[in-house]
């Protein structure tokens, strides 16, 4: 929504436009052109960190920097200012008798928010601040709007999320958090590429939602006159590539789920899915641990991390436990015993576990017990494995106890960070499970998906035993940046 057309220009905006016109009259483009820097603020601070005022005077080195004008003060023929680039701020010191009259006017007329290029000598002030004594100033771009009043530490969350650029200008820790996000993503790619995985791209527009339990966004392809959905997962396409012989593949990208928003859910989010032929879920536990630990080390070093005041031993081997053992530990209820649905329902009522209409088997109730009692107790990294077959439609059954699957979820600080399993590669079993999902959908489970016959056909050509994994990147970034809401790790979160 643009408010520009109805908004009256305020005094500041009028003055800035007049200054823009004055620059044009002087033959200076108010919006500048290419500019060659020799250094950034961070490079200069690092290079000259241990040099005294006198040493800098003797070395007499020069540099050219560029950035946004953030502070400005001075009287008459001398001025001080701070320029901000991606790495931080550096002070500039401007004297009329050094830069000359015309050049000094450019500095004098510059507004907070404008971009300037500054060439000059590296020095330290009497206060000990590393600065550049300008020999020449170049106007690079005019800001026609002043930054918001409280731009040193913008706190209005509406503005932070709607106008992220203002947040990045004014909140250093916010910019750092997004730089960290980029580093985490690069490190995960680097780690997987090093293990021989291929990064692939599969369609965002699907004919049938599949690969996860979620409500899709629907759209329409006009030329083909067909309804389509935005992907809720990349799973079924990636497994087709395993059928095709690609052996080790991953895809990192946006997933779309037409569901509620809260501190850990945004309708579009980033996930990575990884598939490895000839592996099982235990191999994938090792791989998952490797991905998470490499990402953590890249941005936090190789010790434990702190999340909201709790120390997380992310650098140590992750605990591994069966879902049924954990339920027994927390509630005393033992689901290893064979039992009827009625017996399980009675246990649920006894423990006040809410029952849904589509809970048609013991497996559904086991899962409900886990969500109700166990999740909130899981603080340190743990692989919870052995989920019931009814809630794991794409995972292989456990050979020793077919009520359960060779599946795990990674939990840290009560939240799920990853979901993985030995993939179901039996097309007959897969079709049965798709049919069970379709039946659950009929009973009102709006997260259940339909039947993907094309995928079943792919499996009929033969898929090697395979292990697969999905990790929510946004949640991982939240964990590694000690952030409590997903909106703080998405540059442009969905807003009403």
Swiss-Prot record:
Which cofactor is recorded for it? Mg(2+)
By its UniProt entry, which NCBIfam families does this protein fall under? Answer: lysS_bact, PRK00484.1
Which controlled-vocabulary keywords does the entry list? Aminoacyl-tRNA synthetase, ATP-binding, Cytoplasm, Ligase, Magnesium, Metal-binding, Nucleotide-binding, Protein biosynthesis
Of the GO CC terms on this record, one is: cytosol
Q: ATP-binding: present as a keyword of the record?
A: yes
Q: Per UniProt, what is the name of the gene that codes for the protein in this document? A: lysS
Q: Which residues make up the binding site for Mg(2+) 1?
A: 409, 416
UniProt GO molecular function: ATP binding; catalytic activity, acting on a protein; lysine-tRNA ligase activity; magnesium ion binding; transferase activity; tRNA binding
**Binding note for cofactor:** Binds 3 Mg(2+) ions per subunit.
- One GO BP annotation of this record: lysyl-tRNA aminoacylation
Q: Name one Pfam family in it.
A: tRNA_anti-codon
> Where, per UniProt, does this protein localize?
Cytoplasm
Q: Which reaction does it catalyse?
A: tRNA(Lys) + L-lysine + ATP = L-lysyl-tRNA(Lys) + AMP + diphosphate
**This enzyme's EC code(s):** 6.1.1.6
- The residues the record assigns to binding Mg(2+) 2 are 416
Tell me the subunit arrangement.
Homodimer.
By sequence similarity, the record places it as follows: Belongs to the class-II aminoacyl-tRNA synthetase family.
Protein name (record):
Lysine--tRNA ligase
